[in-house]
Amino acid sequence: MFALPKEVPMPQISQLRRFAVPITGTAMVAGMLLIGTPASAAISTTGFKTACVAGSIIGDVHKVTDNLITVDAPASVQPGETFTYRIQPSGTSYPDKDSGATTTNLSRLKVDYAIPANATFVSAAVVAGTSVGLDSVAPNVLRVNDSGNVDGSGGILRLSGNNQVIGNSPTTSTNSEGGIRVPKSKKNLDGSTNGNGDTWFRLPAVDVTMVAGATGVIQPKVRTAGTAGNLGASENFSTQLAKASFLGTQWAPTRCSPRENKDTTPLNAGAGPLATISIASAPVDVETTTSLSVPATAITGSAVD
């Protein structure tokens, strides 16, 4: 079971993802879920591939998936300016059946974003009304450290259901539901019935507020530093737990990193900047001097040359 998915064209979507690595595929839907953004924001969209490793009763299943992440951010900010950027993955899906297994749901979904350099973190929050097809624990954003523990000095922003994930957290499991869940609906993102029985969903956008530093650029990225850049690591930026029925309940904990395939060591563009916010140069104060040449004395009412 858990055979690699086969992509199938559909009228409403550009690509179809299959179980057991459902969260990292790209899906563009015409007119879907336009999100309000701050004035003067520049929209950056980055497409990239991820290599995913899904555990199963037959051993690890490897799959390459397509991804899309959008960032709405100001093109430039002033030194010391408080600003907000918005980041969100595209919609994706999982099938009704795959290789004899009947899917049940996905849960313990997680996306990790790196906190950018050259700015001071202020806050991060889920944007209400930007997710589709989720239930169980409401998505939230936690600042965590490399071990996945909540830490006010951590360098990672974790989108999850209260840190209930499959690994790299104090609240982990690979054989029980938890956190953000995607129940089977067999519906598209717009609520219409999907002809193939696929269940479409979308994780919410996150607004990140920061204060710009003195110089340089600010570049939002997914988490890839250290072990997060390894193939099939619990620290990977995107992880989730698939549940299916095949001779009993089966679980497929899945871990995805931005690389072209399982045999590729270097990370791809997905590990690079998803947007670039320039910090404008501070104005330079130039001292000026005005010299006046006048006679030492003058008669009242007389012109002075």
Describe each PLM feature range:
Residues 202-242:
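Internal, hydrophobic beta-strand segments that form the core of beta-sheet-rich folds
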Residues 161-218:
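Low-complexity, intrinsically disordered segments enriched in Ser/Thr together with acidic residues
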Residues 2, 6-7, 42-149, 171, ...:
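Serine/threonine-rich, low-complexity linker/repeat segments that form flexible spacers/stalks
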Residues 1-41:
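Secretory targeting and sorting signals
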